[in-house]
Amino acid sequence: MNQIMVIGISSGVGKSTFARKLGEAIDINVYHLDVFYWKPNWVEATLEEFSKAQQEIVSQRQWIIEGNYSNTFEIRAENADTIIY
């Protein structure tokens, strides 16, 4: 369990909290997709920018990525060894 996706049904269900606590417990960096999707002043990243950020993360040996964004789901799913729903 080195490359982990944390997804859920909607916002506010505890994905971020769970991912943070899991990351602390197993000493793996946690990446919250909202940080990469939302730029200053609530401007949305382009699909290219958002995808590139995730490609950089999944190239690492260990990661936890938290978030539901379906338009880039495959980037994470193809590289994850564990998916937690």
Task: Say what each PLM segment does.
Residues 7-8, 66:
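Residues at the beta-strand->loop junction immediately N-terminal to the Walker
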Residues 1-5:
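Extreme N-terminal starter segment of soluble prokaryotic enzymes
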Residues 15-16:
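Walker A/P-loop
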